[in-house]
């Protein structure tokens, strides 16, 4: 699995690059993790309802092809796009989602933060507050899009939406629990290591 650090990049070109990568991949294409941050942007999923955008401001809204409702990305949030051929790995999308959740939970545990997945709601939570979001697109036996983990960011734009379609959803981030707060790059090093641990055995065990 190749890990590519792209830094702070605009959302729309990254979205187009994901679609191009997925459309052009073949049986020999190596899976990739893209580690990024984005300037402020709201992204609206395939089944997204306009009423979940509560306040219109100068933050752009981009309609995209992942599942789920509206969410927010901004500087200080770690985003990892998971370009994974799940058919080749002989696994399921549910297992990929679990691997993402488990990797986030293990990463947060390294900072002393007790987090958990919720079987009724996508994402990872600290108590009732959401710290990470997940969203995937399934196409041609592969997935793309991925996860967003709040590290040290301005959370106020989340109050302009119903995050992932849930009214009143309270958001949190690593900076609320850890000071000095690690940088997104420091968190990315731990998170990608956990992702490799989650995914590599699955490939090896099914060869």
Swiss-Prot record:
Pathway: Protein modification; protein lipoylation via endogenous pathway; protein N(6)-(lipoyl)lysine from octanoyl-[acyl-carrier-protein]: step 1/2. It is an enzyme of class 2 (transferase). InterPro entries: aa-tRNA-synth_II/BPL/LPL, BPL_LPL_catalytic, Octanoyltransferase, Octanoyltransferase_CS. It catalyses: octanoyl-[ACP] + L-lysyl-[protein] = N(6)-octanoyl-L-lysyl-[protein] + holo-[ACP] + H(+). Keywords: Acyltransferase, Cytoplasm, Transferase. One of its GO terms (molecular function) is lipoyl(octanoyl) transferase activity. Residues 27-203 form the BPL/LPL catalytic domain. The active site is at residue 164. It is found in: Cytoplasm. Substrate binds at residues 66-73, 133-135, 146-148. CDD domains: LipB (cd16444). Its EC number is 2.3.1.181. The keyword Transferase applies. Its main location: cytoplasm. Pfam families: LplA-B_cat (PF21948). The record marks 130 as: Lowers pKa of active site Cys. One of its GO terms (cellular component) is cytoplasm. One of its GO terms (biological process) is protein modification process. In the reaction, the free carboxyl group of octanoic acid is attached via an amide linkage to the epsilon-amino group of a specific lysine residue of lipoyl domains of lipoate-dependent enzymes. PANTHER family: LIPOYLTRANSFERASE 2, MITOCHONDRIAL-RELATED, OCTANOYLTRANSFERASE. Catalyzes the transfer of endogenously produced octanoic acid from octanoyl-acyl-carrier-protein onto the lipoyl domains of lipoate-dependent enzymes. Lipoyl-ACP can also act as a substrate although octanoyl-ACP is likely to be the physiological substrate. Belongs to the LipB family. This is Octanoyltransferase. It comes from Neisseria meningitidis serogroup A / serotype 4A (strain DSM 15465 / Z2491).
């Amino acid at each position: 699995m190749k890990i590519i650090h792209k830094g702070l990049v605009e959302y729309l070109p990254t979205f187009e690059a994901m679609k191009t990568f997925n459309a052009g991949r073949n049986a020999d294409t190596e899976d990739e993790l893209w580690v990024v941050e984005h300037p402020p942007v709201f992204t609206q999923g395939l089944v997204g309802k306009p009423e979940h955008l509560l306040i219109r401001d100068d933050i752009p809204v981009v309609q995209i092809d992942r599942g789920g409702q509206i969410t927010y990305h901004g500087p200080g949030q770690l985003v990892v796009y998971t370009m994974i051929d799940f058919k080749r790995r002989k696994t399921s999308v549910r297992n990929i989602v679990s691997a993402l959740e488990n990797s986030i939970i293990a990463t947060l545990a390294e900072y002393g933060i007790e987090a958990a997945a919720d079987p009724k709601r996508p994402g990872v939570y600290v108590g009732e507050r959401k710290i990470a979001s997940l969203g995937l697109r399934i196409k041609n036996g592969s997935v793309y899009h991925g996860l967003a983990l709040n590290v040290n960011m301005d959370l106020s734009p989340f109050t302009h939406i119903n995050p992932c379609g849930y009214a009143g959803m309270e958001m949190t981030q690593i900076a609320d629990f850890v000071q000095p707060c690690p940088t997104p790059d420091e968190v990315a090093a731990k998170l990608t290591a956990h992702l490799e641990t989650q995914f590599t055995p699955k490939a090896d065990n099914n060869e």
